[in-house]
């Protein structure tokens, strides 16, 4: 996203972001997710309750398919990580921001940075809790800030075309 923002006038970037966020938020809401933050072209989303992992994966697949069909100026990758978070107000009293905090937030962002456009990178716990049709075999990746590698599986939007 940084290079896209650098190479385009702010008006075009805002137009792109509005189109992208409209697609993403509509789909996340449809699958019962909660949008915590919009940061650049990224969303921080939380799924809770029954079938949370499956709904997160289904939403991610639907987002990548919708972005591809919309022929937006650029694609995106998605990181999914299952773990604990806490919700709370963070910041000085004059500017509190209600958000989710926890290692899971950091890990999902790290997995997102490992995803190519049109791709989901999900940790094994997320995959083991959901139907993993179309995902690659397990692989281990190094994640910034971690000493141990993390087991993940990948899914690419092109898997939908192969299924059809």
Task: Set out the residue ranges of the language-model regions.
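Catalytic strand-loop-helix junctions within cyclic-nucleotide turnover domains
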Residues: 46-53, 78-97, 117-118
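Structural scaffold positions in well-ordered secondary structure
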Residues: 24, 40, 56, 63, ...
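Amphipathic alpha-helical regulatory segments at dimerization interfaces
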Residues: 23-30, 62-70, 110, 114, ...
């Amino acid at each position: 996203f940084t290079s896209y923002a650098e190479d385009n006038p702010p008006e075009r970037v805002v137009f792109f972001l509005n189109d992208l966020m409209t697609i993403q938020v509509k789909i996340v809401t449809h699958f019962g997710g909660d949008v915590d933050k919009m940061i650049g072209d990224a969303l921080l989303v939380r799924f809770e309750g029954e079938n949370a992992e499956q709904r997160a994966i289904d939403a991610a697949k639907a987002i990548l398919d919708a972005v591809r069909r919309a022929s937006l100026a650029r694609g995106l990758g998605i990181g999914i990580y299952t773990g604990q978070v806490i919700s709370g107000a963070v910041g000085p009293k004059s500017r509190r921001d209600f958000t989710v905090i926890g290692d899971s937030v950091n890990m999902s962002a790290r997995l997102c940075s490992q995803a190519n456009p049109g791709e989901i990178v999900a940790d094994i716990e997320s995959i083991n809790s959901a139907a993993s049709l179309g995902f690659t075999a397990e692989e281990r990746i190094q994640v910034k800030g971690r000493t141990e590698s993390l087991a993940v599986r990948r899914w690419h939007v092109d898997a939908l075309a192969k299924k059809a």
